[in-house]
Amino acid sequence: MKINWQKVDNLLPVIIQNVATCEVLMLGYMNQEALEKTLAEKRVTFFSRTKNRLWTKGETSGHFLNVVDMSLDCDNDTLLILVNPIGETCHTGAESCFYQFEKTTQPDWIFLSKLERLIASRKGADPESSYTAQLYAKGTKRIAQKVGEEGVETALAATVKDKAETICEAADLVYHLTVLLQDADLSWSDVIHKLKERHTK
């Protein structure tokens, strides 16, 4: 990367974006040392202007930003980093530091990613705490059985052309399939990658 360090006075603005949801999480700054550390460790490290030192996001909270990809803008003076965030990004507990932004315009598919993270967080939880935790506790066979049941019910609803019921059953199917994927340590990203692979053949 050919960064124009002189233009940015040795502090590069860095936009952090969630690779799964495309949500902008925060803005920070990097000097050359912070960028080198980020590239080496694949975790985002900033230069803190208030503390006057390097600061790895998550070093105290455990909410790291794992680097997936990065790209400079056309003027080589702003960096975009795509990340897989571990936990919330904002110190307020919000997923994004831009939490005050009205999110009604976000694409509906972003919700699926958030649902997937919520379902993943239920693994190993007290079975009494939620239906999802109960499913995990009952094991893979029970989860797979529910996927089969919901698949049949979705097909039956579609067969009789009941749109409202088809939507409800499809929602149940997607939910249980998400649980099954997480139980197998897989995600919708794995499924999407396979679809892309088939599409390009």
UniProtKB/Swiss-Prot annotation:
GO cellular component: cytoplasm
Top enzyme category: hydrolase
KW Amino-acid biosynthesis (keyword) present: yes
Keywords on record: Amino-acid biosynthesis, ATP-binding, Cytoplasm, Histidine biosynthesis, Hydrolase, Multifunctional enzyme, Nucleotide-binding
Chain spans, region Phosphoribosyl-ATP pyrophosphohydrolase: 112-201
Name of the protein described by the UniProt record: Histidine biosynthesis bifunctional protein HisIE
Record CDD domains: NTP-PPase_HisIE_like
UniProt-annotated stretches for the region Phosphoribosyl-AMP cyclohydrolase: 1-111
Subcellular localization, as worded in the UniProt entry: Cytoplasm
Entries under InterPro entries matching the protein: His_synth_HisIE (IPR023019), HisE (IPR008179), PRib-ATP_PPHydrolase-like (IPR021130), PRib_AMP_CycHydrolase_dom (IPR002496), PRib_AMP_CycHydrolase_sf (IPR038019)
Disulfide bonds: none
Lineage of the organism: Bacteria, Pseudomonadati, Pseudomonadota, Gammaproteobacteria, Pasteurellales
Origin: domain of life: Bacteria
Chemical reaction(s) catalysed: 1-(5-phospho-beta-D-ribosyl)-ATP + H2O = 1-(5-phospho-beta-D-ribosyl)-5'-AMP + diphosphate + H(+); 1-(5-phospho-beta-D-ribosyl)-5'-AMP + H2O = 1-(5-phospho-beta-D-ribosyl)-5-[(5-phospho-beta-D-ribosylamino)methylideneamino]imidazole-4-carboxamide
GO biological process, one term: L-histidine biosynthetic process
Pathway named in the protein's UniProt entry: Amino-acid biosynthesis; L-histidine biosynthesis; L-histidine from 5-phospho-alpha-D-ribose 1-diphosphate: step 2/9; Amino-acid biosynthesis; L-histidine biosynthesis; L-histidine from 5-phospho-alpha-D-ribose 1-diphosphate: step 3/9
Family stated for the protein in its record: In the N-terminal section; belongs to the PRA-CH family.
